[in-house]
């Protein structure tokens, strides 16, 4: 198993409309293959290839007297991996 390094992390309470607006902006940046995350003076530029793996999870966790649900959206790729173009017949 490889080693994981967190390059940028953020968690904050937001109004659902603000989250939707952020996701729209993120989608626009993904379409450009380039996302810049900023917080204060911290900045991370992420180059995203055309071929990625999209993982979506909806989870439910029971806590004492509450149930917590979450929606996770994860986009993964291998750095430097190029699209093989799939199988071709010759």
What would you call each of these model-derived segments?
Residues 26-30, 38-44:
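Extracellular/virion structural assembly segments
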Residues 2-6, 44-55, 59-90:
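Long protein-protein interaction modules used by eukaryotic assembly/scaffold proteins
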Residues 33:
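Short beta-strand/loop motifs in extracellular/secreted proteins, especially
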């Amino acid at each position: 198993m490889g080693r994981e390094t967190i390059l940028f992390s953020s968690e904050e309470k937001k109004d659902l409309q603000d989250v939707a607006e952020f996701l729209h902006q993120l989608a626009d940046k993904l379409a450009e293959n380039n996302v810049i995350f900023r917080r204060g003076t911290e900045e991370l530029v992420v180059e995203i290839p055309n071929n990625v793996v999209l993982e979506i999870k909806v989870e439910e966790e029971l806590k004492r007297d509450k149930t917590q649900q979450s929606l996770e959206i994860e986009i993964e790729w291998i750095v430097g991996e190029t699209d093989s173009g799939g199988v071709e017949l010759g």
